[in-house]
Swiss-Prot record:
Protein name as annotated: Regulator of G-protein signaling rgs-6
UniProt biased composition (Low complexity): 8-24, 194-208, 642-694
Pfam families: RGS
Record-level GO BP terms: negative regulation of signal transduction
Length: 734
C-alpha cells in the first residue's frame, strides 16, 4: 500500500517511518500528501497568525458578530490568556469565569463542542482544580470549526483572498509560539486517532525510533511539534505569546483628546462599563450613554456585551430625560377623565432634535407626524420640531392632533392642571424611584409609564423591602378593621342587648328574648303550648325573689317607663272584648337572670312562703309602687274593670248581694315587693297576684283553661278537681 503513496511523496528516508499509516489514510481520501500536507499546514499557520493579531482579526471578528457566532473566537482567545496565568488562585478565578460564560447551564455564550469534552471539563471544574490543559481539547475543536467553517465563509463574503506571509514570517511566528506548530496532516478527519497512531511504534522499527514516539502526549495533533526535541516537554508545549488585551479609544463629551481604555473583563455589559466610566469621569451615571464617535449611533447598553466596544472610537455623552403625553384620537378636553392617555419617559442626547426623537414613537403609536402638534403640557405654547431636546429638559410635552388643538384653543383656558400626578415630578427621578425598564430604539431610549391606577395597585412592589412590608401591614389592617366594623353589628342571642331597657317598642312587641337564651312568650304561644292556670294569676313568690336582684340602674330606667306609661291613653273596649281573655299581652321583663321556682306536685304553692317573704320585705318604709303600669303586663286596674263588667253583665245569675272584697297586702322594701289582690264575684273567686317592681322583673306567668274557671279551693288547697285545671306550669322566662 505504500507504493502508490511513494509516487506522490518526496524520496526521503522518513517514508519508512510509522507515518506511513497516516500517509495511507491521506491517500485513501484522494489527496496528495506532500503538497496538501504542506498547504494545509501553511494555511493553518496563516489563520492562527491572523486571529492572534488584533488588527488582522478585527474584520473577521466583525463578520462573526454579524453571523452571531463570535463566541467561538472569544473562547479561543480566552483560553490562550488562561494558559499564560501562572498563579493558581488567579488561574482558578479566570477559569471559573470561562466555565460560567461558555459551559454553564445558563451560560451567556455557549460554544459548540461535543458532549464528552463538555462532560470532562465539567468534572474537572467540579473537582476544584484548574490545570493548564483544562480547555485544550475544547480549544482545538473550536479552532477546527473556525478554520474550516467560518474562515472560508468570511473569505467568500468579502471577496478577499487569504493574506500571504513569507516563510520567514511564519517561521518567526513558530519560534515565538514554540509548540503550536501544525501537525503533519490536517486532512484527516480524526486528528485524535492520528495522534494516537503516531504514539505507537511500528513492530519492525529500530530501537532508536521507539524513544521518540514514546515521548508523544495524547494531546491534539495541533499541539505537538516533531521538529524540535525540546519542544516535547510539557512546559514548552504550553508556551505561547501573550495575547494583547482588548481596548478602545474613549472621548469625553465634546473633547477631542482620547484615551485608551482596556477592556479587561469580557463578561461585563456595556451598561455596567458605561456607568463605571461615568463614575471615573465625574459624570452622572444615570444620565450618560456611550455612542460611536465615527458614526454617531448609540450603542445599546442592554443587548451588547463589552466585546462590541473593542477597537472602536467611543464618546461618553450626557443625556436628558423628559416625559411626553400622547393623546388618543377619541380624547376630548370637555371630559378629560373619561379617556386615559399614554405617558412615555424618554432619554436622549442634548443635541438631538425634538422631531427626530418623536419620529419612532409616532410610528409606534400610529400617529401621523404631519397632522400633530407638540405643545408644553398644560399650556398652548407650541414646540418646534427642530428644537433641541436639551432646551426642553425636565419638562413635559403633549402630542395632539390638529382637531384637538383647535378644541383646546376654543375652550378658552390658557393653562390646565396636569391630568396625572406623576407629571408634576421631575422626569429624572421617575425611573430612579420606580425602576421602569427602558428600551433602546436607535438613538433614544424610552419607557412606558403605567397609569395611576396601575401604579397604586402595585405600589407596595415598587418600593424597598421595609416600605413594602409597612404598606402591606397597613393594607391588612384596613381590611381587618372593615371586617370588624361589619362583624360588630351582629349580636347573638347570648349577648345582652344594651338598648332593651330604653326601647318600649321592643318590650311591647313580644319577641324579645332574655339573656338566658330561652324562648320568648310569643314563640311559645305561637307553638301552641298549653299553659295552665288563669291569665291574671302571677306567682308572687318568684316575683318577689327576682325583684330582690334589681340593681340601681334598673330603678333609674324604670322612671322612664313610668313617665311614658302614665301618658299612654288606653282606648275603651267593648263589653265583649273585655270579657275575652287577653292572651295577646306579653309579659316582658328586664335582662336580670330569673330564679328557679319550686312547685308542688299539684302545681300549687304554700301560702306561708309568699306571706313570710312579704312580711320580711314590708319592714322598710319605701314608697308604694302604685300607678306604675307596663303596657305588656296585666295590671290590677284592668282586672278590676273586667270583674266589674262581668258582674254587671249577668245580674240574673249573680247573688242578690254582690260583695267585692279587695284585699291588698302591700309591703314596701328597697326592691318594691309585689301586691296581692283577691277579687270575689257571685260565688266565683279569682285570685290574681301581680308583680310590680322598679324594673320589669322576671315573671312566671301561668294561664288556666278558658273553659273552666279555677275555684278558690284549687288555688289555696291544691286538692280535688281536674288535675289538668289545677296544675300550674311555667309559662316563660321573659
Amino acid at each position: 500500500m505504500s507504493t502508490p503513496c511513494s509516487g506522490n511523496e518526496p524520496a526521503t528516508p522518513t517514508n519508512t517511518s510509522p507515518n506511513n499509516e497516516t500517509s495511507n489514510s491521506c491517500l485513501s481520501m484522494g489527496v496528495g500528501v506532500a503538497s496538501n500536507e504542506t498547504n494545509s499546514s501553511r494555511e493553518l499557520k496563516i489563520f492562527k497568525k491572523v486571529i492572534r493579531d488584533p488588527v488582522l482579526r478585527a474584520p473577521f471578528q466583525e463578520f462573526l458578530e454579524q453571523q452571531f457566532c463570535a463566541e467561538n473566537l472569544n473562547f479561543y482567545l480566552a483560553v490562550e490568556q488562561f494558559k499564560e496565568i501562572q498563579d493558581f488562585q488567579e488561574r482558578s478565578s479566570f477559569g471559573r469565569r470561562i466555565f460560567d460564560r461558555y459551559f454553564a447551564m445558563n451560560s451567556t455564550e455557549p460554544v459548540n463542542i461535543d458532549n464528552s469534552t463538555s462532560k470532562r471539563i465539567r468534572e474537572t471544574v467540579e473537582s476544584g482544580g484548574f490545570p493548564l490543559d483544562t480547555y485544550d481539547v475544547a480549544q482545538y475543536q473550536i479552532l477546527h470549526l473556525l478554520k474550516y467553517d467560518c474562515w472560508p465563509r468570511f473569505l467568500r463574503s468579502t471577496n478577499n483572498s487569504q493574506p500571504s506571509f513569507t516563510d520567514e514570517e511564519l517561521a518567526a511566528d513558530d519560534e515565538d509560539k514554540n509548540g503550536h506548530s501544525q501537525p503533519t496532516s490536517l486532512n484527516n478527519t480524526n486528528e485524535f486517532e492520528a495522534a494516537a497512531q503516531q504514539s505507537q511504534p511500528a513492530p519492525n522499527a529500530p530501537a532508536a525510533t521507539k524513544e521518540k514516539p514514546s515521548k508523544q502526549y495524547s494531546m491534539p495533533a495541533e499541539m505537538t511539534s516533531p521538529v524540535k526535541k525540546n519542544s516535547l516537554s510539557p512546559t514548552h508545549l504550553r508556551r505561547c505569546r501573550p495575547v494583547e488585551p482588548k481596548h478602545c479609544q474613549l472621548m469625553i463629551g465634546d473633547q477631542f483628546n482620547t484615551e485608551t481604555v482596556t477592556l479587561s473583563d469580557p463578561t461585563m455589559s456595556v451598561r455596567r462599563w458605561t456607568q463605571e466610566m461615568a463614575d471615573a469621569q465625574g459624570m452622572d451615571r444615570m444620565h450618560v450613554e456611550v455612542v460611536d464617535a465615527e458614526t454617531g449611533s448609540t450603542i445599546d447598553p442592554a443587548r451588547q456585551a463589552i466585546d462590541a466596544l473593542q477597537s472602536r472610537a467611543l464618546r461618553l455623552v450626557p443625556v436628558v430625560s423628559f416625559i411626553i403625553e400622547f393623546l388618543p384620537a377619541n380624547f376630548s378636553f370637555k371630559n378629560p377623565a373619561s379617556t386615559p392617555t399614554k405617558l412615555v419617559c424618554i432619554r436622549a442626547r442634548h443635541s438631538l432634535s425634538t422631531g427626530a426623537v418623536l419620529r419612532p414613537l409616532l410610528h409606534k403609536y400610529t400617529l401621523d407626524p404631519q397632522v400633530t402638534r407638540i405643545v408644553l403640557n398644560g399650556s398652548l405654547e407650541q414646540v418646534k420640531r427642530s428644537c433641541a431636546v436639551g432646551q426642553v429638559s425636565q419638562k413635559c410635552l403633549t402630542v395632539m392632533s390638529e382637531a384637538q388643538y383647535s378644541d383646546r384653543v376654543n375652550a378658552g383656558k390658557v393653562s390646565l392642571p396636569p391630568r396625572d400626578p406623576i407629571l408634576s415630578q421631575l422626569p429624572s427621578t421617575i425611573y430612579e424611584q420606580n425602576n421602569f425598564p427602558f428600551h433602546q430604539n436607535g438613538d433614544i431610549s424610552y419607557c412606558e409609564i403605567p397609569n395611576e391606577s396601575e401604579r397604586n395597585k402595585h405600589a407596595h412592589l415598587q418600593h424597598d423591602g421595609p416600605n413594602a412590608a409597612h404598606q402591606q401591614k397597613e393594607y391588612t389592617l384596613s381590611i381587618f378593621n372593615k371586617f370588624v366594623r361589619k362583624a360588630s353589628h351582629a349580636v347573638s342571642k347570648s349577648d345582652p342587648n344594651p338598648s332593651a331597657g330604653t326601647s318600649q317598642d321592643r318590650m311591647a312587641s313580644g319577641v324579645y328574648s332574655p339573656a338566658t337564651g330561652g324562648p320568648s312568650f310569643a314563640s311559645r304561644a305561637a307553638a301552641g303550648t298549653n299553659f295552665g292556670g288563669s291569665a291574671n294569676q302571677v306567682n308572687a313568690g318568684s316575683a318577689s325573689t327576682s325583684s330582690n336582684n334589681v340593681s340601681e340602674p334598673s330603678k333609674n330606667r324604670l322612671s322612664i317607663f313610668k313617665s311614658k306609661t302614665e301618658k299612654k291613653v288606653v282606648k275603651p273596649e267593648s263589653e265583649k272584648e273585655k270579657l275575652k281573655p287577653r292572651s295577646d299581652d306579653i309579659p316582658t321583663t328586664s335582662t336580670s337572670t330569673p330564679m328557679a321556682v319550686e312547685t308542688k306536685p299539684n302545681g300549687s304553692r304554700t301560702t306561708e312562703e309568699p306571706l313570710k317573704r312579704m312580711g320580711k320585705s314590708g319592714d322598710d318604709g319605701s314608697q308604694e309602687p302604685q300607678g306604675i303600669r307596663h303596657p305588656a303586663i296585666f295590671s290590677t286596674k284592668i282586672g278590676d274593670e273586667a270583674a266589674a263588667a262581668a258582674a254587671g253583665a249577668s245580674p240574673s245569675t249573680s247573688a242578690p248581694s254582690t260583695s267585692t272584697s279587695v284585699q291588698t297586702k302591700t309591703t314596701t322594701s328597697p326592691t318594691k315587693s309585689p301586691t296581692s289582690t283577691t277579687i270575689t264575684t257571685s260565688g266565683t273567686t279569682t285570685s290574681a297576684t301581680s308583680s310590680v317592681a322598679t324594673a320589669p322583673p322576671p315573671v312566671l306567668h301561668a294561664m288556666r283553661s278558658a273553659s273552666t274557671p279555677a275555684t278558690s279551693s284549687q288555688l289555696t288547697g291544691g286538692g280535688g278537681g281536674n288535675p289538668r285545671e289545677s296544675s300550674w306550669q311555667t309559662a316563660a322566662y321573659v
